[in-house]
Amino acid sequence: MATFFGEVLSVYSRAVEEDEYEDMTNENEEDEQIRREIEEKRSVEVCWLLGSQDGPLQCSDLIIGAGPNASGFIRAYLLSTVGWTAVAWLSFWNERSRGSERPTVVPGPGEPSCVLYRLESCPTVLICQCQGFVAEDQLFQFTEKVFSCVQTRDLNVTILSDCSSADYKTSDYLSGSSTPFLRCLKTSTYTHTVTCPPLEQPNICSGLAAAVLSHCQVHQISAVLYQCYSDVLHPDSASMQMFAATLSSVLKLEQSLSADVLQRVTRVSEIQSNLYT
């Protein structure tokens, strides 16, 4: 075929085209297999501790604690008292988990975990204590799994979370004496009285707390998020005590009983955060 000088012609070779197609097919199959393995490894599963569970648990109030101070408060003020039974736990793995595989046995005390507890004297009150890091790509699935454990009809959800005061945006000077403090966000269906001012713009919530609140808003579940802003990196008693008033309408807290446990929780955290110990 005649052409002008310097023109580049595409030369078609059926053998070359077929080889490239086979290579691309093999690569796609390998990529797909790797993707499935990663998804399986990072999936979230509910493990029941009650034997065979036919359906979701009856629940009127669900308390979810996410973050060091929130989970520490639940441990000191609630789980330290008698009458709570572990009913389920969530098995998941990510880059911050210990080991290289998703756990198959319930984590021991002090290990990263997410456990669902039920109050024996009032079985419709449940607590979800999350002491492990949930990756961003796991938040949606994690939230779906938590709410699959409970009946959502006439459900009230209280979310406890904590955040660094350095992330709080305000036009006024934020002194150390003004921390810790609480701010709240609620869904449109939440009609109960809140115990602190609402979170001002342009502040936002993120992580597991935001995922749970968004899920409740979409599914029209009554929910409120209480976020504690603190200038201390590890759990401390002052920050934990900020959550006490948020549960006054749901549970009666034993202040004197939790004092010793509260000291143990903060003491362990201080030892772990000390680089010179």
UniProtKB/Swiss-Prot annotation:
InterPro entries: Proteasome_assmbl_chp_1. One of its GO terms (molecular function) is proteasome binding. The lineage of its organism: Eukaryota, Metazoa, Chordata, Craniata, Vertebrata. PANTHER family: PROTEASOME ASSEMBLY CHAPERONE 1. This is Proteasome assembly chaperone 1. Belongs to the PSMG1 family. The gene is psmg1. Degraded by the proteasome upon completion of 20S proteasome maturation. It comes from Danio rerio. Chaperone protein which promotes assembly of the 20S proteasome as part of a heterodimer with psmg2.
